[in-house]
Regions:
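Nucleotide-activated chemistry modules centered on ATP-dependent adenylation/adenylyltransferase
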Residues: 1-263
Length: 263
């Protein structure tokens, strides 16, 4: 929570990048505690690709209303319609990469100088180099050689006009830490994280939710499976796992026993 308070103290226009996944939900929960009894003093920024799970969008809207926090939505479809990016086609088509342009536009339009995210170092190799305060230049680029020291939990948020920071309060948390915290605090999550029945296709060894956004390959047959999601993103790229974990306690035990990362 001290990282969130440090952001509020050092930056003029901070925002929380909210994906609707468990990590951004935990960040938002921590922000609510950090600034209580006041409201969260920064908006939630969500980049809507148009290919999100409906459950994610419903949860996002309900959470913003319950907390009384401003919700800013950047639309990938608007970016496509404006001719600033081109829609991908084919069986591997995804809007995952396209959302980068929408995010940068949203940051620029909102003049946000600090964007708080839920990324963790244990998720993938690229994120292992991230600091708590991660500097971005005026083109939105990250240079690992141009990061500030963070000795003794001292953070340097100084930046030139047009530059900004990504801030990662959960940088040193693990997936198990996240679930232990969610279980302890009894934090509400989208139903997608719990075991449920869903029509799926298995593609290249990955279980994907069957949807109108997922072009079906020849020979693929959707089948009903009992699955849950460890991480949430677009319908077209978010892989599921077969599971019967339908409570927080079962999910936490499942995560503790797994030897495969969520990404």
């Amino acid at each position: 929570m001290f990282v969130l308070r440090e952001v509020a103290a050092q930056f003029e226009r901070p925002a929380i990048l909210f994906s609707g996944g468990k990590d951004s939900i935990v960040v938002t929960h921590l922000a609510a505690k950090a600034f209580a009894p006041a409201r969260i003093p920064m908006p939630l920024v969500h980049i809507d690709t148009g290919h999100n799970f409906p459950e994610t969008i419903e949860f996002r809207d309900a959470l913003a209303e319950r907390l009384g926090v401003q919700l800013i939505v950047g639309s990938v479809q608007d970016t496509i319609d404006g001719g600033r990016v081109r829609e991908e086609t084919g069986a591997q088509a995804s809007r995952n990469r396209l959302q980068i342009a929408t995010l940068l536009e949203t940051i620029e339009n909102g003049k946000y100088d600090a964007c708080i995210g839920g990324a963790r170092r244990d998720e993938e190799k690229a994120r292992a180099k991230e600091r708590f305060f991660s500097h971005r230049d005026d083109f939105g680029q990250w240079d690992p050689k141009n990061q500030r020291p963070e000795l003794w939990n001292l953070f340097n948020g100084k930046h030139m006009p047009g530059e900004n920071f990504r801030v990662f309060p959960l940088n040193n948390w693990t997936e198990l830490d996240i679930w232990n915290y969610i279980t302890r605090e009894q934090i509400a999550l989208p139903s997608l994280y719990y075991a449920h029945q869903r029509m799926c296709v298995v593609r290249d060894g990955v279980i994907l939710a069957h949807s109108e956004y997922l072009p079906q390959r020849e020979g693929e047959t959707p089948e009903m499976m009992q699955i849950r999601f460890r991480t949430l993103g677009d319908l077209t790229i978010t892989g599921a796992i077969e599971s019967d974990a339908n409570t927080l306690e079962k999910i936490t035990a499942e995560v503790a026993a797994t030897r495969v990362t969520e990404r």
